[in-house]
């Protein structure tokens, strides 16, 4: 189990990323825009740098919904590999069965 503070930190990062998503996209469009002047680009870069670090989506970490484990995360299920195996063995994931060949 991950510490509660680590799970809470991820929740804050998700909220910040959602809050600043539109502003971030707008500034990045100005920076990468062909028609933008150098001065506008530089202003956009400075504004982008002044946004909170945790508002960047790349700072988010996928975590298991049940345990908060950051490694071995399977996106399809939203769980770590360990919890996927446990729930699959109990038959709680519809359509998933153990492979045998």
Curated annotation (Swiss-Prot):
GO terms for cellular component: cytoplasm; small ribosomal subunit. Belongs to the universal ribosomal protein uS14 family. GO terms for molecular function: rRNA binding; structural constituent of ribosome. One of its GO terms (biological process) is translation. HAMAP family: Ribosomal_uS14_1. PROSITE patterns: RIBOSOMAL_S14 (PS00527). This is Small ribosomal subunit protein uS14. The lineage of its organism: Bacteria, Pseudomonadati, Pseudomonadota, Gammaproteobacteria, Enterobacterales. Part of the 30S ribosomal subunit. Contacts proteins S3 and S10. InterPro entries: Ribosomal_uS14, Ribosomal_uS14_bac/plastid, Ribosomal_uS14_CS. It holds the Pfam family Ribosomal_S14.
């Amino acid at each position: 189990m991950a510490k509660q503070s680590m799970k809470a930190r991820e929740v804050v990062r998700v909220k910040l990323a959602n809050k600043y998503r539109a502003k971030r996209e707008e500034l990045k469009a100005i920076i990468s825009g062909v028609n933008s002047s150098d001065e506008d680009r530089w202003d956009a870069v400075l504004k982008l740098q002044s946004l909170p670090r945790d508002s960047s989506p790349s700072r988010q970490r996928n975590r298991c919904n049940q345990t908060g484990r950051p490694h071995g995360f399977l996106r399809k299920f939203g769980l770590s590999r360990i919890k996927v195996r446990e729930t699959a063995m109990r038959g709680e994931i519809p359509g998933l069965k153990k492979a045998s060949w």
